[in-house]
């Protein structure tokens, strides 16, 4: 029921196979009847022959290395890779790092809504993280790669309540100070930050600013910059799917050459979808 079990299963399976580890593949070339694979280990290069090759090197989010160059050297098309399932760069919640809350988030690119999700938000000094942000990050990265110039993230920390309901709930709260009243919906540290972002003074009285408090629970922040690759779980981009047979994952132009998993231009949301794609494409 945890990731360690998955790793242990892989290790056990690999123990039944002849696997050479700590060897870096430096070249992949066609040869008569199959393929030639050059690998470097301990300063020495060894060449292997194979009738079939399965390219399962993941992406640079996995290793930090651009292993796709082995395939592009053979003339196989690819799309640029950008970080996905990663925190959205944004400093709006600096000072509330580590606070979590449930919200609905809508991502806008150049003023137009492009994606919406609900889930947990994790505040960080330099980013908005958590399940909600991670799932929006794929759309964010793709649109940034395509040239979108500005982004907004509209958060709603009371997504199941209308404005009148929020105001009535706040009005009924025994808490008098405005910023403290937001604990009815969010943790106090986040409520303090939201109130400050909305321009509500620290000494404000709740009953004098119910509309402002309602608006504070529905802030708009501005992510900027590409998510960090080292924080990404996967990337958007990879080897062009049009170059591979969807029934077998074999290259349409090179017999005996296969690609699976994250090496291909496929990515999914959080929740194990990317792992499942790796296993399912490998099973083909």
Which residues does each predicted region cover?
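Glycine-rich loop(s) and the adjacent beta-strand/alpha-helix scaffold that form part
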Residues: 52-94
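Short beta-strand to alpha-helix junction loop
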Residues: 1-12, 60-65, 90-93, 202-209
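Flavin (FAD/FMN) cofactor-binding core of flavoprotein oxidoreductases
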Residues: 1, 80-93, 98, 221, ...
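A conserved short coil-to-beta-strand element within the FAD-binding core of flavoproteins
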Residues: 21-35
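A glycine-rich dinucleotide-binding beta-alpha-beta segment and adjacent secondary-structure elements
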Residues: 192-267
């Amino acid at each position: 029921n945890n990731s360690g079990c998955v790793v242990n299963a892989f290790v056990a399976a690999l123990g039944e196979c002849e696997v050479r580890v700590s060897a870096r593949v430096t070249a992949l070339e066609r040869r008569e009847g199959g393929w030639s694979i050059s690998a470097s280990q301990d300063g020495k290069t060894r060449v292997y022959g194979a009738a079939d090759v399965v390219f399962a090197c993941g992406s640079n989010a996995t290793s930090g290395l651009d292993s796709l160059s082995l395939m592009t050297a053979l003339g196989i098309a690819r799309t640029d890779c950008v970080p996905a399932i990663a925190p959205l760069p944004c400093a709006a919640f600096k000072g509330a790092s580590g606070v979590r809350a449930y919200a609905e988030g809508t991502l806008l690119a150049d003023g137009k809504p492009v994606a919406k999700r609900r889930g947990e938000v994790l505040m960080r000094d330099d980013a908005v993280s958590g399940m909600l942000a991670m799932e929006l990050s794929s759309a964010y990265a793709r649109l940034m790669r395509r040239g979108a110039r500005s982004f907004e993230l509209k958060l709603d920390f009371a997504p199941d309540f209308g404005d009148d309901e929020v105001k009535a709930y706040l009005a009924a709260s025994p808490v008098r100070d405005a910023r403290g009243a937001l604990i009815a919906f969010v943790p106090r540290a986040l409520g303090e930050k939201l109130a400050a972002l909305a321009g509500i003074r620290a000494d404000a009285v709740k009953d004098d600013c119910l509309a402002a408090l309602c608006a504070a629970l529905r802030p708009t922040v501005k992510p900027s910059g590409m998510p960090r690759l080292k924080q990404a779980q996967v990337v958007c981009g990879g080897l062009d799917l049009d170059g591979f047979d969807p029934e077998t994952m074999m290259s349409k132009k090179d017999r005996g050459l296969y690609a699976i998993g994250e090496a291909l231009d496929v990515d999914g949301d959080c929740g194990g979808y990317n792992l499942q794609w790796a296993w399912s494409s490998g099973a083909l």
